[in-house]
Amino acid sequence: MVPSGRKHSGKLAKPSVGDQAIRAYEFEQEDKKDLSGSEEDAIEEKTPTLEKQGKKRTSAAVEDMGGEVQNMLERFGADINKSLLAKRKRLEMYTKASLKTSNQKLENVWKIQQEQRQKLNQEYSQQFLTLFQQWDIDMQKAEEQEEKLANLFRQQQKVFQQSRIVQSQRLKTIRQLYEQFIKSMEDLEKNHENLLTGAQNELKKEMALLQKKIMMETVSCYSEL
């Protein structure tokens, strides 16, 4: 992986192979023009024979010059190719190393995150398990307590019903006893009235007899006198 944070603004870009070849060709053409111009000036001053010989020599020199330039361009191109291949290999090596390092870092990060997740899951899983176990225990206790309360309520309800039955019986007994008491009192009053009436009648009879006896004794006394 090639780092994207490097700055290239401070370095000048290297000319490409095509630009260098074009510059070499232009330089060759300028040399040809300079050489041909100087030869023509010299030939104009010489005889026609020397002019022909000078043209032959100039063309030969130009051909030699062109061959040297061609060789130089070929060598330059080969050097550029070698340099590009070397740079390409270095770039590939750097890229592979960078990818390997990045993969190792990512694997380490993933491994650490995985371990942290497992640790967190285990920690909270244990806490949740403990809480759920306690919850089950509390629910069992609540159900047992509810069952006890239900039984107690049924017992209390039964006791209350029995108490109501007993109270109803007691109240009925009290009512019956009260009625008996009232009846007994009435009977007693009637009996007392009858006894009193009888006593009064007896007393009246006795008083009448006594009065009669007294009258008879009084009459008897007066008779004897």
Curated annotation (Swiss-Prot):
A Pfam family that the UniProt record links to this protein: Cor1
Compositionally biased spans, kind Basic and acidic residues: 44-53
Transmembrane segments: none
Processing after translation: Phosphorylated.
Cellular localization per UniProt: Nucleus; Chromosome; Chromosome, Centromere
Chain positions covered by the region annotation Disordered: 1-59
Keyword match Cell cycle: yes
Renumbered ranges of motif Nuclear localization signal: 87-90
Alphabetical GO biological process terms: cell division; meiotic cell cycle; spermatid development
Coiled coil regions in record: 65-218
Positions bearing Phosphoserine: S36, S38
Biased composition (Basic residues): 1-11
Record InterPro entries: XLR/SYCP3, XLR/SYCP3/FAM9_dom
Region (Interaction with DNA): 52-57, 87-90
Keyword Cell inner membrane: no
A GO term from the CC aspect: lateral element
Entry keywords, A to Z: Cell cycle, Cell division, Centromere, Chromosome, Coiled coil, DNA-binding, Meiosis, Nucleus, Phosphoprotein
Ranges for region Important for oligomerization and fiber formation: 68-73
Source organism, top-level taxon: Eukaryota
The record's note on its domains: Composed of a long central coiled coil domain. The N-terminal and C-terminal regions interact with DNA.
Subunit architecture: Component of the lateral elements of synaptonemal complexes. Homotetramer; the tetrameric helix bundles assemble end to end into long homopolimeric fibers that exhibit a transversal striation with a periodicity of about 20 nm (in vitro). Interacts with SYCP2. Forms a complex with EWSR1, PRDM9, REC8 and SYCP1; complex formation is dependent of phosphorylated form of REC8 and requires PRDM9 bound to hotspot DNA; EWSR1 joins PRDM9 with the chromosomal axis through REC8.
Stated family: Belongs to the XLR/SYCP3 family.
UniProt name for this protein: Synaptonemal complex protein 3
Source organism of this protein record: Bos taurus
